[in-house]
């Protein structure tokens, strides 16, 4: 395991730096590192690392979402209002509709299989989007209209919506029925996730005021609580018979947002600590995403797979455009939002192989498209954000 970690960090840093020098997204270098080191290429990563890959990726997500919360001003979100809610489900819904319309014509699959494929591909990646938006907040680009905050908030809920749809479509393909209780879990996951985060944020705020603790120790406390919140998601859902859900990741983000509101100076210091943790977490996250990608599948889809990815992205962009109707955003800012809301990585790496493991006839092509979505949209989206934000957003 130690050798595998050394390879992940050293090779990831070197290749990431090379790509940065070539003016390409460093995360592309990290994903390629994972593909090369992973089980489908050189197979240099120990099974002990691969077996906990999902947990390590979740750990990295916890770090970046906590940092997002620590930089998320609630007042900014209040100003945005309606579009923030629409961005949580409209773009993903449009992308799934696009998949249902186009995929059966290109790959001779059923409408239901196309819907399942759409639910795998539709989730935006907070791991790609959030660090870029935090950079925009630091540099004061788009902050006068709360654009980074809008996109970060939408991305955190978008995943919940898509995963519930994925569960429902999986049940239908298996020959079962859609449980309407699954859809009740969407609002309850959001509401109870936010409430739990606010309550814990309030308790931590009082605790940190009463007891003098080093900032490093505060980070350890917050991280530990975050791990517990994410771990008990399934247990809480089962406790209430699957009717009530709770989003641990949304609760984690809410803790950070509450600390930002109640103790702004502390939140700035903690954000700095988390940004240092993200240096290592980012490498682990994207290298392991790459390791989960079977590059051989990507070649199986050919040109049609690439055409499909770009076609459904157009549908997604139309969904973003619709969500931003009657806002104060100008044409350039809307274009930026459409571009920024495209990258995919973490959810696709996590659920892309599930239909194949369940023995679905469409399982292989769904995995192929999930792999392509990661390889195309994660680096391309990160690159597009990087080269366009100074041209399309106003500097405050």
Label each region the model flagged:
Residues 5-17, 157, 163, 167-269, ...:
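Core mid-bundle transmembrane helix pairs that form the ion/substrate translocation pathway
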Residues 74-142, 295-393:
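Transmembrane alpha-helices that form the ion-translocation and gating core
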Residues 1-8, 49-66, 111-126, 185-197, ...:
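Structural signature of hydrophobic alpha-helical transmembrane segments
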Residues 97-102, 160-168, 227-244, 285-298, ...:
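Hydrophobic alpha-helical transmembrane segments in multi-pass integral membrane proteins
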Residues 14-18, 124, 160, 190-199, ...:
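Hydrophobic transmembrane alpha-helical segments of multi-pass transport and channel proteins
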Residues 31-38, 53-80, 96, 169-174, ...:
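Hydrophobic transmembrane alpha-helices of secondary-active transporters
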Residues 140-157, 161, 180-184, 269, ...:
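Membrane-interface alpha-helices at helix entry/exit sites of multi-pass transporters
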Residues 11-22, 66-79, 129-142, 200-212, ...:
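C-terminal ends of transmembrane helices
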């Amino acid at each position: 395991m130690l050798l595998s970690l050394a390879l992940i960090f050293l090779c990831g840093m070197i290749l990431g730096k090379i790509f940065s020098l070539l003016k390409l997204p460093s995360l592309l270098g990290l994903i390629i590192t994972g593909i090369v080191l992973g089980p489908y290429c050189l197979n240099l990563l120990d099974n002990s690392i691969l077996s906990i890959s999902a947990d390590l990726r979740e750990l990295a997500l916890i770090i970046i979402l906590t940092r997002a919360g620590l930089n998320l001003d609630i007042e900014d979100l209040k100003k945005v209002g309606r579009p923030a809610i629409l961005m949580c489900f409209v773009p993903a819904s449009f992308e799934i509709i696009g998949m249902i319309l186009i995929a059966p014509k290109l790959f001779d699959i059923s409408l239901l299989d196309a819907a399942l494929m759409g639910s795998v591909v539709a989730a935006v990646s907070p791991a790609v989007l959030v660090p870029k938006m935090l950079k925009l907040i630091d540099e004061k680009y788009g902050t006068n209209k709360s654009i980074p905050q809008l996109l970060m908030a939408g991305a955190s809920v978008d995943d919940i919506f898509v995963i519930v749809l994925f569960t429902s479509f999986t049940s239908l393909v298996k020959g079962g029925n859609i449980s309407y209780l699954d859809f009740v879990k969407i609002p309850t996951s959001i509401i109870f996730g936010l409430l739990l985060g606010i309550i814990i944020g309030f308790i931590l705020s009082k605790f940190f005021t009463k007891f003098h603790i080093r900032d490093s120790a505060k980070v350890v406390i917050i991280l530990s609580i975050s791990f517990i919140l994410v771990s008990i998601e399934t247990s809480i859902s089962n406790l209430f018979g699957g009717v009530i859900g709770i989003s641990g990741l949304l609760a984690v983000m809410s803790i950070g947002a509450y600390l930002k509101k109640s103790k702004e100076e502390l939140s700035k210091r903690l954000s700095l600590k988390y940004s240092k943790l993200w240096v290592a977490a980012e490498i682990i996250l994207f290298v392991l995403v790459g390791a989960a990608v079977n590059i051989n599948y990507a070649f199986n889809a050919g040109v049609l797979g690439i055409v499909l990815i770009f076609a459904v992205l157009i549908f997604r962009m139309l969904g973003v455009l619709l969500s931003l109707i009657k806002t104060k955003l100008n044409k350039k800012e809307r274009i930026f939002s459409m571009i920024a809301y495209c990258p995919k990585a973490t959810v696709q790496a996590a659920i892309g192989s599930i239909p194949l493991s369940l023995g679905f006839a469409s399982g292989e092509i769904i995995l192929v498209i999930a792999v392509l979505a990661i390889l195309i949209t994660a680096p391309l989206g990160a690159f597009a954000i990087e080269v366009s934000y100074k041209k399309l957003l106003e500097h405050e």
